[in-house]
Design a protein with these regions (language model features):
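Single conserved hydrophobic/aromatic residue that forms the stacking wall/gate
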Residues: 1-12
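A general structural motif
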Residues: 77-83, 101-105, 123-126, 145-156
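Peripheral docking tails and interdomain loops at the edges
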Residues: 146-147, 152-227
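Glycine-rich phosphate/diphosphate-binding loops that line cofactor/substrate pockets in enzymes
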Residues: 85-97, 116-119, 158-164
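Peripheral (often C-terminal) accessory segments that flank ATP-dependent C-N-forming ligase machineries
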Residues: 18-94, 98-99, 103
């Protein structure tokens, strides 16, 4: 949570104004709550414009790549995250999800989310290493092939045929084949306006949120209702 989110959007009383008065030695009324003592959660979701940056690899590094942010409040972290993700253009997938979950740690991080998707009726498509890992851990899935591999179904073809509703693609390493295959999948998702997530923690949290929160039950509240 950024300072601006805590200082303004999350607080009925502006903490930035309060801090400024303290620094200037002006009299202030002592807050009746700790800075982080809230009965609700605030989450900011970044918005990216990779669809306008032709051929750019839509994967995040240390550089600032977002072109905007949306800060949302919720009664819990799942509600706040789901509201924020929807606000920056993500959609709830209807049926088919493509998984390529990176290295061993990221695969382990995504395992419970993959199980949750299956429990909620989603069909999982996975590239080689991810497919093997899911199968070994009892999660049914369909193997798809990288652009550089022979065989069908091809992940890229499924994307172009609009057979995939969301892509989770976690970059694994810097090998030529990994970068080339991953780039083609990520770039196709962006160009075809298919929701793409490239971070395992965010993907897991988003999946748990939309699987356990019914959209009809997602509360719509004004900022003034959070006190």
């Amino acid at each position: 949570i950024s300072c601006s989110l805590v200082g303004s959007e999350m607080c009925i009383r502006d903490r930035i104004e309060l801090a400024t008065k303290v620094m200037l030695g002006l009299p202030v009324e002592k807050p009746n709550k700790s800075l982080f003592d809230f009965d609700y959660v605030g989450i900011k979701a970044s918005q990216f414009s990779f669809n306008r940056l032709q051929k750019a690899d839509p994967v995040l590094g240390v550089d600032m790549a977002s072109t905007g942010e949306v800060g949302c409040l919720g009664d819990d972290s799942g509600t706040a995250l789901l509201t924020a993700m929807l606000s920056v253009g993500h959609r709830i997938p209807k049926k088919n999800i493509l998984l390529s979950t990176g290295g061993a740690k990221q695969k382990a991080d995504m395992l419970e989310a993959a199980r949750t998707l299956k429990e909620h009726g989603y069909t999982l498509y996975a590239t080689g290493g991810t497919s093997r890992y899911l199968t070994e851990n009892g999660v049914a899935n369909h193997l798809v092939y990288w652009p550089s591999e022979e065989g069908t179904p091809q992940a890229l073809t499924m994307l172009h045929n609009r057979e995939i509703d969301m892509v989770v693609n976690i970059p694994k390493d810097l090998t030529v084949s990994e970068l080339s295959n991953g780039y083609k999948i990520r770039r196709a998702a962006v160009d075809l306006n298919i929701p793409l997530i490239t971070n395992s923690r965010l993907a897991s949290a988003f999946i748990q949120a939309f699987c356990h929160i019914d959209m009809d039950d997602l509360p719509i509240k004004s900022w003034s209702e959070y006190k």
